[in-house]
């Protein structure tokens, strides 16, 4: 086992390269610049393509072109840049083109600040652009997991021919931890008979940004709904910690889950009946992990570095019968374990 000490931004870039990413384009924006810089160094070493684009709008459309050829392609940005990419993202979904987008979130709204925040949750999990579409959204909580989820992201993108967003925040992006790349397994890409190869000696292939008539668009939407239904059924991922006998369930993702875990372990050591559920797929939301808890848990604590965006998804699963409390806020305010610990004691007492 060989461990490499690196930032989260670097780990996700190296994980992407080991997954077979050979096209990267992006525009500098904090707090994701280390990812951008790492790709600039590494892509030439693996005979890949690195392009610094003139804007996020240009970048996401370059991803469209690369994805049309079947190349594993990735871009990255942060909140304001993701907003600029929204038209390209919905067009990628309409064209059913696989790609990976990394969102290293910063505090908002507006231009915001580079302080860590989880305020892009709603934007990512509810699509991010116009139309009825979804991106698969993964939420890592460690540097090791960033590298591992990068490989999973490309696999899922190819499997479902769909954009995948890796949603993390500036704290995770800048955090340095050891990474064991022996655990980062590249998942093979499937055959892509739809991809444009430019050879001219085979059947004509066309990738459409949208159908040209109403019946075609209606049919596309029906196909997307069926695809998303399959993804929701088969791709829910989560981690459970100390949920045996838990009467209070803490729900948190990303860096907030690291904070919540410290508090849950401290409370458990003192006998408080509390456990943690950490969503790994933010979309599809891990409803299966929560549905049966209505019979055993008497309260939920949603811990997020935003105004409670994931709480809305939790409420849809749990319904009105059990109390759901939120701890946290946006604007770059970091949550501390003692805050979560005190809230756990209040709810469990």
Regions found by a protein language model. Name each.
Residues 1-127, 134, 326, 336-344, ...:
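Thiamine diphosphate
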Residues 7-11, 225-248, 261:
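Glycine-/acidic-rich phosphate or pyrophosphate-binding loops and their flanking alpha/beta elements
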Residues 32, 161-240:
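Conformationally flexible catalytic loops at phosphate/diphosphate-handling active centers
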Residues 115-169:
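Conserved thiamine diphosphate
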Residues 240-277, 283-289:
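Redox- and metal-dependent alpha/beta enzyme cores, enriched for Fe-S-associated oxidoreductases
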Residues 265-269, 276-320:
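Glycine-rich, anion-gripping cofactor-binding loops and their flanking helix/strand elements
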């Amino acid at each position: 086992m060989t461990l490499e000490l690196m930032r989260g931004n670097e780990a996700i870039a190296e994980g992407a390269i080991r997954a077979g990413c050979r096209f990267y384009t992006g525009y500098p924006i904090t707090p994701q610049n280390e990812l951008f810089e790492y790709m600039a160094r590494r892509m030439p070493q693996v005979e890949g393509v690195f392009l610094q684009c003139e804007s996020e709008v240009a970048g996401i459309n370059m991803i469209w072109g690369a994805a049309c050829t079947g190349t594993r392609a990735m871009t990255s940005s942060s909140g304001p840049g993701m907003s600029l990419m929204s038209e390209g993202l919905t067009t990628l979904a309409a064209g059913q083109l696989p790609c990976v987008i990394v969102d290293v979130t910063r505090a908002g709204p507006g231009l915001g600040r580079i302080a860590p925040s989880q305020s892009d949750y709603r934007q990512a999990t509810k699509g991010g652009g116009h139309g009825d579409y979804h991106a698969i959204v993964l939420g890592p909580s460690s540097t090791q997991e960033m590298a591992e989820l990068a490989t999973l992201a490309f696999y899922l993108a190819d499997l479902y021919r769909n954009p995948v967003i890796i949603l993390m925040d500036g704290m995770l992006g800048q955090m340095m931890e050891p990474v064991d790349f022996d655990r980062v397994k590249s998942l093979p890409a499937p055959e892509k008979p739809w991809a444009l190869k430019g050879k001219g000696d085979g059947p004509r292939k066309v990738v459409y940004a949208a159908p040209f008539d109403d019946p075609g668009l209606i049919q596309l939407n029906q196909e997307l709904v069926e695809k998303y239904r399959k993804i929701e059924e088969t791709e829910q991922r989560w981690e459970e910690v100390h949920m045996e006998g838990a009467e209070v369930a803490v729900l948190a993702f990303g860096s907030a889950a690291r904070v919540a875990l410290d508090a849950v372990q401290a409370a458990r050591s003192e006998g408080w009946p509390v456990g943690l559920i950490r969503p790994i797929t933010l979309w599809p939301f891990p409803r299966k992990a929560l549905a049966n808890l209505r019979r055993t848990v008497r309260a939920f604590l949603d811990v997020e570095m935003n105004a409670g965006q994931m709480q809305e998804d939790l409420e849809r699963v749990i319904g009105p019968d059990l109390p759901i409390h939120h701890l946290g806020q946006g604007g770059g305010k970091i949550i501390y374990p003692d805050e979560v610990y005190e809230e756990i004691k209040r709810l469990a007492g």
